[in-house]
Each structure stands twice: as structure tokens, then as C-alpha cells.
């Protein structure tokens, strides 16, 4: 019986794969049968992630995606070793919490270069005619609920995530003739190792306050990874140009 949710025989590229959501996306994709290409800056953590993958035939690459000039060679190297790419999950990104008066041009440039420019360039290279599966593919941008709702001192981060949400719609139209689906995943607060050490989760009282904002409680990395697996699979073949909000009900209040 055909299983439209499987990722068997698919090659999936995951950025930011050395920790947090990106790491879990890579693990979950491998569990569903995919060959996974892991990309992140930290080589040691990448290798630790690779050890947790199911199956064989995976590839890990230590690379700083803000090096836009050499992304073409990066993608060519992946395709030469793994064959055409079936899916790209752009998990790599950074955040910032600061008011407008403290936003220096170099800080703005850093966030946009990491969250937006690197994502656009990698997607451009992956979707080259010779690099992507001719039968179709799936691309996922990672935004945030901060691209949909406001929060004090989060405007810079929101600028970058809003750009991905808006751009996704036009790209989805542009690449639909080639059966390439492009969607956005916008998570709420996820209990990653980094977030667990933040005051809003580490402090018991603040954690209780934070949890009260989420009708279904705080999310786990698996919740986001499962959404990505679905969007990468053939089960989502008729979904494109969408911003999938996965936030335990935060934005419905």
C-alpha cells in the first residue's frame, strides 16, 4: 500500500541542523526514510546529530550560510554526492530582542543576512534546474509567530520573519509550474535547550505566566519536525504558498 507520508528515496537538506528544531527535523526526516544533508557551522555538534539519524547515506557539512558567495559550490557538492534534491528546510537563523533606538545598521544587516539573505540564496541555488528533482520538490522557510503578531522589542526579528512569509507567496506562484512547493512554518515558543535557560522558562513564576499564553502548553521540537515531515511528503502535494502556524493556540487568543 502506498504511503504518501513517507520520505523514502527522498534527499532532504536541513540547515541549522546541529541543535534545536533543525536537529529534530533532521532526525525525524531520517526516521521517515529520507537521506539527510545536515548543514550548520559547528562541526562537532553536526557529527553528534548525524549519529542520531536513522538509516545510512547521510551527509554532514560544516558551512556558514552567510558566506553567500560560495553557496553555489556548496549545492553543487551536495548534488554530486547525493543526487537531485527533493526537499530543503531552512532552519538556520538568529534572533534579537532590542528597541528601535538601539538598532544599529550592522545589527540589522547581521539579522537580515542570516535570516533572509542566506535563505534566499540557498533556495535559489537549490532550485537550479540541475539541482532539484525534476518531478517536484518542497521548500520550507522558517519564520515565527513574531512574523504574525507583535511583541515589545521584537521588531527587528519580526522584520526578517515577515519578509519570509511575504516572499513565500510569490515564490510559490513562480515555481508552481515546476511542481516545487514553497511553504513557511511559524512556530510558537519551543522548549529547546537554549530556550530552557531563558528567564521566561528558567524562573518558575515566569514559566507559569508564559505557559498560560499557550492553550495547548509549550511546544516541543518534535511538534515542529512533524509539521515539516508532512510538508516535505507527497501527502502535502496540494499545499503551497502557505504560512503554517504551529503555536499551541497562542495566536488564537
For the regions a protein language model found, what residue spans apply to each?
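Alpha-helical segment proximal to the catalytic Tyr-Lys
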Residues: 128, 173-177, 237
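Short, small/polar-rich loop/turn modules that mediate ligand/substrate recognition or access, typified
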Residues: 89, 176, 181, 239-241
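Short C-terminal tail/terminal secondary-structure segment
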Residues: 2-3, 149, 229, 240-253
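Active-site helix of classical SDR
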Residues: 123, 160, 168
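Substrate-binding pocket helix/loop in short-chain dehydrogenase/reductase
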Residues: 99-100, 104-112, 206, 210
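Conserved glycine-rich cofactor-binding loop
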Residues: 18-19
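Residue(s) in the substrate-gating loop at a strand-loop-helix junction
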Residues: 144
Amino acid at each position: 500500500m502506498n504511503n504518501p507520508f513517507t520520505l523514502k528515496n527522498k534527499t532532504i537538506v536541513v540547515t541549522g541542523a546541529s541543535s534545536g528544531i533543525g536537529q529534530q527535523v533532521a532526525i525525524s526526516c531520517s526516521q521517515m526514510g529520507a537521506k539527510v544533508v545536515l548543514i550548520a557551522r559547528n562541526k562537532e555538534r553536526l557529527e553528534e546529530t548525524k549519529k542520531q539519524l536513522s538509516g545510512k547515506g547521510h551527509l554532514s557539512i560544516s558551512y556558514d550560510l552567510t558566506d553567500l558567495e560560495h553557496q553555489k559550490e556548496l549545492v553543487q557538492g551536495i548534488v554530486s554526492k547525493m543526487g537531485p534534491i527533493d526537499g530543503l528546510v531552512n532552519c538556520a537563523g538568529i534572533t534579537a530582542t532590542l528597541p528601535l533606538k538601539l538598532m544599529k545598521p550592522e545589527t540589522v544587516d547581521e539579522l537580515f543576512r542570516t535570516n533572509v539573505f542566506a535563505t534566499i540564496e540557498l533556495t535559489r541555488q537549490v532550485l537550479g534546474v540541475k539541482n532539484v528533482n525534476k518531478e517536484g520538490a518542497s521548500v520550507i522557510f522558517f519564520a515565527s509567530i513574531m512574523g504574525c503578531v507583535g511583541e515589545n522589542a521584537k521588531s527587528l526579528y519580526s522584520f526578517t520573519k515577515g519578509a519570509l512569509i511575504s516572499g513565500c507567496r510569490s515564490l510559490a506562484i513562480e515555481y508552481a509550474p515546476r511542481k516545487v512547493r514553497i511553504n513557511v512554518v511559524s512556530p510558537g515558543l519551543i522548549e529547546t535547550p537554549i530556550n530552557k535557560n531563558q528567564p521566561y522558562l528558567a524562573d518558575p513564576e515566569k514559566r507559569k505566566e508564559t505557559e498560560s499564553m499557550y492553550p495547548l502548553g509549550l511546544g516541543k521540537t518534535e511538534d515542529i519536525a512533524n509539521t515539516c515531515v508532512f510538508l516535505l511528503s507527497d501527502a502535502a502535494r496540494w499545499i503551497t504558498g502557505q504560512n503554517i502556524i504551529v503555536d499551541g493556540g497562542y495566536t488564537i487568543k
